[in-house]
Amino acid sequence: MSIIEAIIIGIVQGITEFLPISSTAHIVITQFLFDYTFPGFGFEIFLHIASILAVILYFRKDLLQVIVGFFSYFKDKSEENRIQFMFAIYIIVATGITGVLGLLLEDLVGAQMKTPPFIAGALIITGTFLIIIERFFVYKDRTVKDMTLKDSIIVGLGQTLAVFPGISRSGATLITALFSGLNKETAVRYSFLLSIPVILGTSVLAIGDLLDGTLVEQVGGLPLIISFIVTFFFSWLGIIWLIDFLKRSKLIYFAFYCFALAIFVFFYFDHNMTIDLE
């Protein structure tokens, strides 16, 4: 991998990771555009780790609050500790549902789903649900203290859909969290914190390739480092921008983007093209 390719991939991954527009779809589209062969699934997960590092650092206070509250609840049954304890449980439940269903659906998601028509269709589905949640759904004002087990199950099921290329993980979790009645601030926080165990869980698949030198051999030491740093930097910017954007604007603008990108993907690329990230 060249330095330029490492920078481009890092920028695309970082910017799109947490926006409701599917980072995997954009990585695949980038490969279509530049006729570039992706190093493998291990490299994709390696970049996800950079994105998650940005989340951990940005939400470090929230994360610490949840962890401390979770363990403190065993000794101190205060209301604040109870809220944080239950929030941790809701993260665990949603993650568990996603993990189990993700494994069951693993064999279903093959190279045939990494084609322009499938990705375009998935982007249209994402855009459609973004419009539905904005135009036909009345926002409620439930916060973390109002969450229930039902909310975590709904969001966990929604997050599972992200195994399909073109379905955004952040989009799926935001939509289902809002649908369950959580306010925007709580939905965004829940979505970001949920990404940590999900992506760290899949990152074990890349550790072997990294330790035995496979990733370094496939990508190159310097491009690997550069892609990681660039991904981290643009993920950090993406987090800041998305949180600020959602305070001022609506998810429907992402829907318009998904529709435009779907049209471009469907009509610009050969429908027989496939890219397997495995």
From Swiss-Prot:
InterPro entries: UppP
Enzyme class: hydrolase
One GO CC annotation: plasma membrane
Listed GO biological process terms: cell wall organization; peptidoglycan biosynthetic process; regulation of cell shape; response to antibiotic
Reactions this protein catalyses: di-trans,octa-cis-undecaprenyl diphosphate + H2O = di-trans,octa-cis-undecaprenyl phosphate + phosphate + H(+)
Top-rank taxon, per record: Bacteria
Regions that span the bilayer: 1-21, 38-58, 85-105, 118-138, 191-211, 223-243, 251-271
Protein name according to UniProt: Undecaprenyl-diphosphatase 2
Keywords assigned: Antibiotic resistance, Cell membrane, Cell shape, Cell wall biogenesis/degradation, Hydrolase, Membrane, Peptidoglycan synthesis, Transmembrane, Transmembrane helix
EC numbers, comma separated: 3.6.1.27
Topology relative to the membrane: Multi-pass membrane protein
GO-annotated molecular function: undecaprenyl-diphosphatase activity
Gene field: uppP2
